[in-house]
Amino acid sequence: MPGGLFSYALMAALATALLVAAVTDIKRREIDNTLNLAIALAAPLWWLATGLGWWDVGFQLALALVTFVVTCALFVVRQMGGGDVKLLTALALWFAPAPFLQLVVLMALLGGAGSVAMAAWNLDRRPGESVRSALALGASALWVGGALAVLTALATGRPLLSTAALQSIRATLPAGWIVALIALLVLAGFALGFVHLVRRQKSRMRVPYGVAIALAGVWVLAQQALTSAAASSTVN
């Protein structure tokens, strides 16, 4: 990696800042403006350390601008907090498009799983709605389990199902119309349960998406550091 130890020091500093952001978001449901500003202002040091040209710098600025516009739209519809908007925009100055897209996908998986789990915990179980409550909890378990399975596959680099497992499943499947009918029933149950989960909340919750952004950022940083270290050891 261009910049050597200085690049690794910057990555460590960014990872530390992200962990601080996660802790403050959990404790106070907000991320300090000074922290977001520090992350943004440190980005030029990262560009210098990694040898970015002017064209690449302009591309990073454009990526940050697009990120800011999109996240502001989410802020307007109350799907993202102001601190989350600033943090994700600041991170867009650090990551190239491909790693940043990976960060956004990881953020969506982590944030989605966390928000659904919190909604299940906050579910208002009313008398006479036991079936719908069960569907809601089942839908949330399916959602969280699916997100965790994808995250595990990404972390280990292994597919969700091996080729042998897929072949075994295909061999044991019943007739096509039965499979389609079961799939429709599962989807209908999931949809009904999810709608009930959204409608029956004890109170309005603010999901700490800053935690998901921070953890996703640390994840991508760790991958970049390991890849760079492996490449350096191969060259040496």
Q: What name fits each language-model region?
A:
Residues 1-236:
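A membrane-topology feature that recognizes alpha-helical transmembrane segments
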